[in-house]
Amino acid sequence: MASKVSPSCRLVFCLLISAAVLRPGLGWYTVNSAYGDTIVMPCRLDVPQNLMFGKWKYEKPDGSPVFIAFRSSTKKSVQYDDVPEYKDRLSLSENYTLSIANAKISDEKRFVCMLVTEDNVFEAPTLVKVFKQPSKPEIVNKAPFLETDQLKKLGDCISRDSYPDGNITWYRNGKVLQPVEGEVAILFKKEIDPGTQLYTVTSSLEYKTTRSDIQMPFTCSVTYYGPSGQKTIYSEQEIFDIYYPTEQVTIQVLPPKNAIKEGDNITLQCLGNGNPPPEEFMFYLPGQPEGIRSSNTYTLTDVRRNATGDYKCSLIDKRNMAASTTITVHYLDLSLNPSGEVTKQIGDTLPVSCTISASRNATVVWMKDNIRLRSSPSFSSLHYQDAGNYVCETALQEVEGLKKRESLTLIVEGKPQIKMTKKTDPSGLSKTIICHVEGFPKPAIHWTITGSGSVINQTEESPYINGRYYSKIIISPEENVTLTCTAENQLERTVNSLNVSAISIPEHDEADDISDENREKVNDQAKLIVGIVVGLLLAALVAGVVYWLYMKKSKTASKHVNKDLGNMEENKKLEENNHKTEA
């Protein structure tokens, strides 16, 4: 027996079919959701009092409906249709708000809320839009370098997993790059994942670089739409190595050119301003037309003065692109004549010359026994004090370490010379006898006494300085005696004697010998006296000349006066004679 369907059920079924076909409603309403979030769609219908149930459906691309959720107003129960893509993802609230968890791109559909009464069906459509933020763009497949004046692929800017697809923009130093024929070419490509329906967008940039692009940052960005509107994400900056040809060559000298001296090692370094810099060059040495192929450095060892000249380097393939420099190898020669150890006799003449040859003006310093001399030594008559160690030293101040020195060890020899002096002590009880000796090598002194007498003290000797020293004894002779002083060195033996009266007999004392220092003082005083005398003589001579000129003029004047007086007297005598004749 067939079941009977009530008239009200038949009416509801007809209304649902007609609602599915006619799709009346309140108009379009859009819900934006982020990928992976929960989509919340309010029903947007006022719930009628005689509501029987509510349903949600979505429409396929061909317009056919697919029911997904049902809620009864009387039984307060919820039922979800067996739709695989929405299994365990749906939630229908009491106010008929539908929530879809874990939003997917496939959820981007037209959903419809349906409220059904016994006599009517009310619909409210909702359009769902799902957005997926893309990954941060990155520049991949980067060119290891870019060459000037060549259109070359710089790299790819890629942004993954976006929905809808984004738009990529390239920037140079923060400014947008636009396609320019022959200079900038941009190729855009997008791909969609069949499973996730997400887009991967790629933009390839071909760029013709110039030297102005050195250290310039390149970036890219992706612009996309999200639930709240348009947004942009930027990549990290990338700086590319720019290759460009060498336009200028420079040459450097190590060590610095003004400090090169004989014996140094010179390194020539040639540099090109290209990138990458040239690795090989041609080096040209003075007087050698053929170049030497080498790396960017060329070293000359133990250079001599003949290495002075012009040096040049050039590119291997462009000989006209070259650089040159002038190198001066500083030198310093010193010749001392005589040098080494020289033995001369006292009174001899010894010319000494220190000859300098240098690349620049050199300073010359003379030292004697480590004491600086005011002038170079000159020996017209050698003295014992001239003996010593002489050093001629020269240096170039501008060149560190360039100095030379030669030494002369002068030995002044002489036979012993003796002078004896005596002096009575003011007390009158003793006499001091001194034997002054000159000579080199140092003579040995011996005393002998002839006659009776006694030696009060032992022999006393002075220091041996500049070939001189003395020996003295103190005696108190009771009678006249003769003292003999003997001085002997490798050259000769010299003897001198001195008669000394008894202590009771007064006698004339002989002055001590003048020391070198006192002799110099005496010489200085003598020079001063001679200068004063010469000055006085010159003054007297000038005064005499002046006096002679004065007297000469005076005599000339007196002659004229006497002549006039004589003429007057003669005239007077003639007149007197005339008077006598007349008488």
Curated annotation (Swiss-Prot):
GO process annotations (BP): adaptive immune response; axon extension involved in axon guidance; axon guidance; cell adhesion; heterophilic cell-cell adhesion via plasma membrane cell adhesion molecules; motor neuron axon guidance; neuron projection extension; retinal ganglion cell axon guidance
Region (Disordered): 562-583
Disulfide topology: C43-C113, C157-C220, C270-C313, C354-C392, C435-C485
Highest taxon listed in the record's lineage: Eukaryota
Glycosylation sites: N95, N167, N265, N306, N361, N457, N480, N499
Cytoplasmic compartment spans: 550-583
Stored Gene3D superfamilies: Immunoglobulins
Annotated Pfam families: C2-set_2, Ig_3
Membrane topology: Single-pass type I membrane protein
Gene deletion effect: Mice are born at the expected Mendelian rate, are viable and fertile and display no obvious external phenotype. Unlike wild-type mice, that have tightly fasciculated and smooth nerve bundles, mutant mice have more loosely bundled nerves with many single axons extending out of the main nerve. Eyes from mutant mice display a variable degree of retinal displasia. Besides, lymph nodes from mutant mice display reduced weight and cellularity, but appear otherwise normal. Mutant mice have only half of the normal number of hematopoietic stem cells in their bone marrow.
Regions annotated as coiled coil: none
Extracellular side: 28-527
Occurrences of domain Ig-like V-type (ranges): 28-120, 125-234
Signal peptide range in chain numbering: 1-27
Tissue expression as described in the entry: Detected on brain motor neurons, in differentiating retinal ganglion cells and in adult retina. Detected on leukocytes and on lymphatic endothelial cells. Detected in spleen B cells and T-cells (at protein level). Detected in adult brain and embryonic spinal cord. Expressed at high levels in the brain, and lung, and at lower levels in the liver, and the kidney, as well as by activated leukocytes.
Domain Ig-like C2-type, residue spans: 245-328, 333-409, 416-501
Keyword S-adenosyl-L-methionine on entry: no
Compositional bias per record (Basic and acidic residues), positions renumbered to this chain: 569-583
Keywords: Adaptive immunity, Cell adhesion, Cell membrane, Cell projection, Disulfide bond, Glycoprotein, Immunity, Immunoglobulin domain, Membrane, Repeat, Signal, Transmembrane, Transmembrane helix
Compartment(s) of residence: Cell membrane; Cell projection, Axon; Cell projection, Dendrite
A GO cellular-component term linked to this record: plasma membrane
Function: Cell adhesion molecule that mediates both heterotypic cell-cell contacts via its interaction with CD6, as well as homotypic cell-cell contacts. Promotes T-cell activation and proliferation via its interactions with CD6. Contributes to the formation and maturation of the immunological synapse via its interactions with CD6. Mediates homotypic interactions with cells that express ALCAM. Mediates attachment of dendritic cells onto endothelial cells via homotypic interaction. Inhibits endothelial cell migration and promotes endothelial tube formation via homotypic interactions.
Domain remark in the UniProt entry: The CD6 binding site is located in the N-terminal Ig-like domain.
Subunit structure: Homodimer. Interacts (via extracellular domain) with CD6 (via extracellular domain). Homodimerization and interaction with CD6 involve the same region and cannot occur simultaneously. The affinity for CD6 is much higher than the affinity for self-association. Interacts (via glycosylated extracellular domain) with LGALS1 and LGALS3. Interaction with LGALS1 or LGALS3 inhibits interaction with CD6.
Protein name: CD166 antigen
Organism: Mus musculus
Originating gene: Alcam
